[in-house]
Amino acid sequence: MSLNMFWFLPTHGDGHYLGTEEGSRPVDHGYLQQIAQAADRLGYTGVLIPTGRSCEDAWLVAASMIPVTQRLKFLVALRPSVTSPTVAARQAATLDRLSNGRALFNLVTGSDPQELAGDGVFLDHSERYEASAEFTQVWRRLLLGETVNFNGKHIHVRGAKLLFPPIQQPYPPLYFGGSSDVAQELAAEQVDLYLTWGEPPELVKEKIEQVRAKAAAHGRKIRFGIRLHVIVRETNDEAWQAAERLISHLDDETIAKAQAAFARTDSVGQQRMAALHNGKRDNLEISPNLWAGVGLVRGGAGTALVGDGPTVAARINEYAALGIDSFVLSGYPHLEEAYRVGELLFPHLDVAIPEIPQPQPLNPQGEAVANDFIPRNVAQS
């Protein structure tokens, strides 16, 4: 099975070390463009662009990278409760059209009550998933070309429609990650690819089996992906030394503050990440070559595969054997590590190299009539 390898655009900052200004660098448009172009040339399938108040806007960043890349896909967040599904469907179709079919979408429900309140969202965990399920139903139906009337608990639309369809049919693939039962049910019923954070293989296997069974109950099959950091070097010793350097400027106070912030979230996945290290610096190798040091101060994906190319490739293939076909990777700093992964890891894997999409045929189109429909040719009387 060929593997889809993704990279990451660090719109919330980048550098050589975690938890310090030491070794940091400016993350401006030019730098993000360098990373995107490196990923494009090295054969990555796409890039994940993060979302939230600590990040630049993912949609604008993705749109700005379209002209400077050829085949790279952009995995961009959909935010139920923050954005209406009709607006999100128009945005998604437009991004897909402008990129010639290079748009992918990642459903993000949110987990930090403090940040959500700042965005005007005051739903609890279960209510957010109710709203996300309704959002996704409307979003998918619009992209399928339906005129949608929907009267849900959280979302109400009447006569909603999309005039400009996406390039990818029936719609651009929808990714989603969540560890709670209600999250897995949403994934099983509505999304195309279920993402998990980088837990030890036995825990990942358990989640995959749960989601696969839930999807089968809906008569569906679903793909799987995993989000991991990677520290790959020419030797295993060099890789572990690089891992230790990454957290060499962290002090206990910074770790404690970060863990306190993570504790206020209601994300089951974040709780599972925190349990891998319990906020302590010792025993961070939680599974062979799987290191939890990143999660001491970074929310979300908090583990890294560490080793030389053949070793990391062997660990990736262990996850692939569980049914995972997509790997969303990152490393610090992201420009240099994109090259290291491409040069030291890719030769030891069966990597799916994306093709440059072919230009779409030009279809003449008149101006929309009455903000309601696109004029079509009619017989002359």
Swiss-Prot record:
UniProt cross-references to Gene3D superfamilies, sorted A to Z: Luciferase-like domain
Catalysed reaction equations from the record: an alkanesulfonate + FMNH2 + O2 = an aldehyde + FMN + sulfite + H2O + 2 H(+)
GO biological process: alkanesulfonate catabolic process
Record keywords: Flavoprotein, FMN, Monooxygenase, Oxidoreductase
EC code(s) of this entry: 1.14.14.5
Sample GO molecular function, one term: alkanesulfonate monooxygenase activity
Superkingdom, taxonomy of origin: Bacteria
InterPro entries noted in UniProt: Alkanesulphonate_mOase_FMN-dep (IPR019911), Luciferase-like_dom (IPR011251), Luciferase-like_sf (IPR036661), SsuD_RutA_monooxygenase (IPR050172)
Enzyme class: oxidoreductase
Subunit: Homotetramer.
Protein purpose: Catalyzes the desulfonation of aliphatic sulfonates.
HAMAP family, per database record: Alkanesulf_monooxygen (MF_01229)
Miscellaneous comment text of the record: FMNH(2) which is absolutely required for this enzymatic reaction, is provided by SsuE.
Family to which the UniProt record says this protein belongs: Belongs to the SsuD family.
Protein name, UniProt field: Alkanesulfonate monooxygenase
Annotated organism of origin: Escherichia coli O6:K15:H31 (strain 536 / UPEC)
